[in-house]
Amino acid sequence: MISQFEIIGDNKIGVLPKQVDQLQMCRDIAASKDLQENDSSFMLVDLDKIIERFQLWKRELPMIEPFYAVKCNTDLVLIRILASLGCGFDCASKDEIDIVMGTGVSAERIIYANPCKTRSFIAHAMDRDVKMMTFDNPEELLKIAKLHPNAEMILRIAVSDPTATCPLNLKFGADPIIAAPQLLKTASEEGINVVGISFHVGSGCNDASAYRNALQHAKNLCEIGEGLGFKMDIIDMGGGFPGAEHHNPFEKIAETIRDALDEFFPDTNKRLIAEPGRFFAAGPFSLVANIIHATEVPASKITKDPKDCADHGYMYYINDGVYGSFNCILFDHAHPIGSPLFDTDRNEKFMSTIWGPTCDSLDLVEDKKLMPKMNVGEWLYYPDMGAYTLAAATTFNGFSKPVPMYVMSEEMWESIRDSTHV
């Protein structure tokens, strides 16, 4: 169990003598809450895993600087840990810039990676000396030139993987063949400083070859930009890196990127950056929700098949839902899979539905799920719940967000404790 408590920012951190076992730690916390008759949901945050993910990144892609996509999860402890490791930050708004700089991160470690920015936010970026920022259209280019003449502009191109969980090229990115060269010419004519090329293959990329195609376009555009007198020092590879077990593992994506860099940018002195979000945020966060109600129904009510009317089914209601942490189901196309937190000897499984706590029938967490019969007061465990969950959670209907509980091992604590960001 926890051997000591430390502080990161304003948050209490439980330090353990050995590596964190997320499932067992969740069981220990839930058992303690049961003794206190406390059924509130909670989010265990394993800070070791953030450091391990950073180490994995540096091992597989040592030539690329990670700039964490703050929109994915604005948890301040997560941000402080990444800052202490030397990570940069991808911000999309005034508030995100202030959140990051509030932890002591310098402006040089921030990219304002939103191609369509509010005018007052651009002025704020200038006030805070944040210079790197993206654009994908002439109107944005001229708007930034007027409001932030010292900005270092990075041209975002549309190269999204069409099979990605969340393709992004419908909203952002200039056509790399037609529009992008013209934007470089416009910037040159207006005397605006363009320093590189940016792309984003889509959140939850399924096709690693999308990175190769994007880097090929980036090489061509760098040559055009250099011909116009720009230095073109930066290649920003965006996000799309998986944060949990995935049919297209990170190591395979990293291999594709390394090969493409060798092909298109051999012996380069360019600054290579990327904007991973879920890669860092997903795995450290485990959600534990309490079953607040259970009711038996004909299985046909769940399967919508009249032939199942004689079978038993169960509908469970838990104290978190799509208006809370599970908003990822609606906004991130996620499919969280929960399981009983504690082992059970109830081997028979029944067709089940997991509902959130609100009065809205849209608040559906899992459907047509086979699981043992559960009772009110028991707990369900959902791993890998840190990406695009808490960042968009609400308190609709008066239901609270889960409380984060932070833990890490003594070894990892010693590795970061002296950082100015902690």
Swiss-Prot record:
E.C. number(s) listed in UniProt: 4.1.1.17
Residues of the active site: C359 (proton donor)
Subunit structure of this chain's protein: Homodimer. Only the dimer is catalytically active, as the active sites are constructed of residues from both monomers.
GO molecular function annotations of the record: ornithine decarboxylase activity
Pfam families given in the database record: Orn_Arg_deC_N, Orn_DAP_Arg_deC
Pathway: Amine and polyamine biosynthesis; putrescine biosynthesis via L-ornithine pathway; putrescine from L-ornithine: step 1/1
Enzymatic class: lyase
Gene3D superfamilies assigned: Alanine racemase, Lyase, Ornithine Decarboxylase, Chain A, domain 1
Protein name (database record): Ornithine decarboxylase
Mutant phenotype after disruption: Deletion mutant pc13 has a reduced brood size and reduced enzymatic activity. Smaller body size as compared to wild-type. Reduced putrescine and spermidine levels. Double knockout with the polyamine transporter catp-5 results in a reduced brood size, delayed postembryonic development, and a more marked reduction in putrescine and spermidine levels as compared to the single mutants.
Catalytic activities: L-ornithine + H(+) = putrescine + CO2
Single GO BP term: putrescine biosynthetic process from arginine, via ornithine
GO cellular component: cytoplasm
Residues spanning the membrane: none
Keywords from the UniProt entry: Decarboxylase, Lyase, Polyamine biosynthesis, Pyridoxal phosphate
Binding site for pyridoxal 5'-phosphate: S203, G240, E275, P276, G277, R278, Y388
Binding of substrate, residues: F331, D332, D360
InterPro entries: Ala_racemase/Decarboxylase_C (IPR009006), De-COase2_C (IPR022643), De-COase2_N (IPR022644), De-COase2_pyr-phos_BS (IPR022653), Orn/DAP/Arg_de-COase (IPR000183), Orn_de-COase (IPR002433), PLP-binding_barrel (IPR029066)
Function recorded in the entry: Catalyzes the first and rate-limiting step of polyamine biosynthesis that converts ornithine into putrescine, which is the precursor for the polyamines, spermidine and spermine. Polyamines are essential for cell proliferation and are implicated in cellular processes, ranging from DNA replication to apoptosis.
